[in-house]
Regions:
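Terminal low-complexity/charged segments
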Residues: 1-166
Length: 166
């Protein structure tokens, strides 16, 4: 069954222009169903986001999402979902990191990133260097661990009781 709304289309020459603008900080590209993902060197994520926003018109940071791949040396992936309102086009910028290495914060470009980075920190334990308020946002302040990591036990580390009667 086809849908009556237009499908997202590739922007003509966009990937090549991005490759030229990002240079050595661009590690890989992948396009699928009209959406392109760019894998970026961790230390270059702020500049890559600035280029996407200022040179290519991706004005809106829609989401920052984490993913955990325990089999990789840099097990965490941080995904930045950007939208160009003028072109009606989305892209994804991805960086990889390990537990010890912080990802540079993009709060200088989009202040709303502070909330999104806090969520990734809380659920995966990924630190963001330069985030002015990196504390838990979804779990209790005394919560132990990061619940969306693949090695987090399904029952948690501590039994919590919210009712004195139980």
């Amino acid at each position: 069954m086809s849908h009556h709304l237009p499908r997202m289309k590739e922007r003509e020459g966009f990937v090549d222009a991005c490759k030229a603008a990002l240079g050595a900080s661009l590690l890989a590209t992948k396009s699928h169903v009209g959406e392109t993902s760019f894998t970026i060197a961790r230390d270059a994520i702020v500049e890559a986001c600035r280029i996407a926003r200022d040179q290519f018109g991706y004005q809106q940071l829609m989401e920052i999402a984490g993913a955990d791949y325990p089999e990789r040396p840099e097990r965490f992936e941080v995904n930045y979902h950007l939208l160009s309102l003028t072109e009606n086009h989305r892209i994804r910028l991805k960086v990889s990191t390990d537990e010890a290495s912080a990802v540079p914060s993009v709060t200088s470009l989009w202040p709303v990133a502070g909330w999104l980075e806090r969520e990734v920190f809380d659920l995966y334990g990924v630190a963001f260097a330069g985030n002015p308020d990196l504390r838990r946002i979804l779990t209790d302040y005394g919560f132990e661990g990061h619940p969306l990591r693949k090695d987090f036990p399904q029952t948690g580390y501590v039994e919590l009781r919210y009712s004195e009667a139980e």
